[in-house]
């Protein structure tokens, strides 16, 4: 798997299955700090993949984690991540 975090432009995932997924936010909030946002994308994606074995759901969670972290001064809380999740849109390319 190859996961590319693209900041405000979302993320791309090339899954080992050969499918390509794109994550975007339908609405965004002001960025407070990008420190740790990429790491949060990776951690959220891995947690989601281990939990569900579903690439689209894992990418959605990873994108929400990274975005929520960027919207805060420190790492995002679970509540913050859950608030961002509905705004994450996944498409298959």
Task: Explain the meaning of each model-derived region.
Residues 1-93:
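Conserved phosphate-binding/catalytic region of the ribokinase-like
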